[in-house]
Amino acid sequence: MGAGQSTNTSGHGASPEEMSRILAHRFASKCFTPLELTHLKDNLYSLALKQGDIHYWNEEVLSRFLGIPDGDEKFGLGTLDAGPVIFRMVSYLGAFPFQNTLAPSVLTFDAMVKVIVLLTDRYGKVLRRGKKDRIKLLFGSLADIGRKEASPITSGDKSDNDQGRPETRSDEAGFSVDKPSNDADDYNDDDDLVLAALESLDAIEVFKHDQRIDRTVYEAHISFDTFQRLLMLFVVIAPLQSCEKTSEYFSQLNEESLKPARYCVENILTSFDIGDRTKGIDYETFYWVISTSLPYMFDPLTPLFEHLLFSKNLDLSRRKDSGTCSVSEEKQTKTESYFSPSHPPVILPGSFKPCILDSAVISHLSFFLSTSSPTPNLLQNGTRLHGVFSSDTHGESLTSFSHHVLTWDAPSILLVTGSNSHSSGDEADIITVGAYIPQPWKLPASTSTSHYDTSHQSQLPCLFQLSPRHAVMQGSPSINSLKSNLPVVSFSTKSGIAIGCKIPPPTRTSMDTSRPTPAGSGSLWINPALENAEFFMSNGLSHEEGVFLPPGIARWSPSHPPSKAESETIKISIYNIEVWGVVQTAPTPAQSPYHSRTSTANGDIPDAVARQQANWNFEAREAERRREIHLNVGGGDSEEQSGRALLEMAGIIGDSARRR
């Protein structure tokens, strides 16, 4: 009890600076291994500038170490000038949990410890109550309005004497975005990270005195220019691993290879746009779009800042007198040959040349698509993509589609690109939509029902639009209770390909022209000729049940609630269709549920690519066997007809064989 009372008294009487240092030390001891902490100290102190007894980093040092562009006009208009944006974020996060008083913080060792813990999601080891998302904290670090001038330490200064004296006075004004707007003694329930930090220090009273209720955050905005530069960085380095050199991702870029990245960024920005970009992005729009449509967009920050936990000066794998290269040299060699902007490493060798899928599209998909659990990001969880079908390579026919897609018994991603049927087909009118199908496509005559594990997002389907606007419709949690005429996927030679549509009842009339119709908040229909498609979205106010939830776009966000049901149907003249199989290369604890259809015929083949090839080999052997049987039927026409009739009755040829 004595220790508890002592801590309590210390917490109440300590200044924000002291409490901030205590939290940093607690983060350092709980969230890093001793080896990581040693590497971090070596990196920070070996490159640090010095002002008196204070060692710190400025923007130039931070950008150079992370390997990100800082004031680089190489690619024009500064769209890759992410250094100032990252430095702004870090200066804000380094003041956690006292952003009002201490931000922007000087990037000392204590500040950088907190930054790394927050940006790499390690705070759960200390802050048990903290939310898994950091959206509000990240918004505050990016907001442009009301910031005070940064510390006198500037990135443009060259000598220690000219760097300016770092100050950490608690009576200075911090970011005005964090200034309390009233004097109430309660606090914002959204600040769980801050509250958890202060509770761990027994310093709630300090928090109440320092911040109170923060309402101005809801009035602040992020400029589109700032957000564009950050998005460009994320699109380029999305595949980054902790052991890779960031500079390799930029050294291979040129103006031509950056065009897809810029196009991708513009499409994402459109989902935040409510008509006037000069006002920037407000908090409610930011929170709505990020949480519903871009939940993994900030994931590249984790490997980027984990670079600080590896020091080249302390590389224990070096062998001075060895004739073989070190582990780090092997990693570097692997990294340099592994990444190529023109052919992303996530695509497995042997796949067809993609017309839709490129590095920018893969990065875009990784911002929202969950393909595994507990690590959802497809670029961080070992996911590889295998080319299953391409209309450009395999032809525009449902026969070819069924041959390639229905024999794939693992999750898949469908991509469709084309032009708006009501436009002239200019580049601005190019439309790309798609869907994530977590279970195998079923045969047309299949009567089995699918069951989806709603506890994991990777087990739910997803419908999305990538261009000219980003929109995501996640699978409904009530998907298993939908009626049988609302399947996730329907495939038929008569009605085409339907995703999230309402399927009409079967009819005996050969002239029946009924086709799947839109349902719920989103659907995609492709006609049997694979020439046209219809992409449907609604704001969900019609309350019609369906496979997908409403899209998270700005114009239908809670901050701009529509007064009535709204929907949008885009008619697409198709250019290309691609289906990419999802292959998990990382070991998973549980056996994959996608083996049942081929396990009896081909044995328990663990790899989806091998299982598909085994299916094709089996079909080829059966075709050869049928051909030999047909050739062995001798005699005249009557005997040939009798033999054919026997084969049809046995189900080897004819309609019954096709339905098997």
UniProtKB/Swiss-Prot annotation:
GO terms for cellular component: cytoplasm. Signal peptide: none annotated. Residues 157-172 have a biased composition (Basic and acidic residues). It holds the Pfam family TLD. It comes from the Eukaryota. Transmembrane segments: none annotated. Residues 150-187 are annotated as: Disordered. InterPro entries: TLDc_dom. It is found in: Cytoplasm. SMART domains: TLDc. Its main location: cytoplasm. Belongs to the RTC5 family. This is Restriction of telomere capping protein 5. It comes from Trichophyton verrucosum (strain HKI 0517). The gene is RTC5.
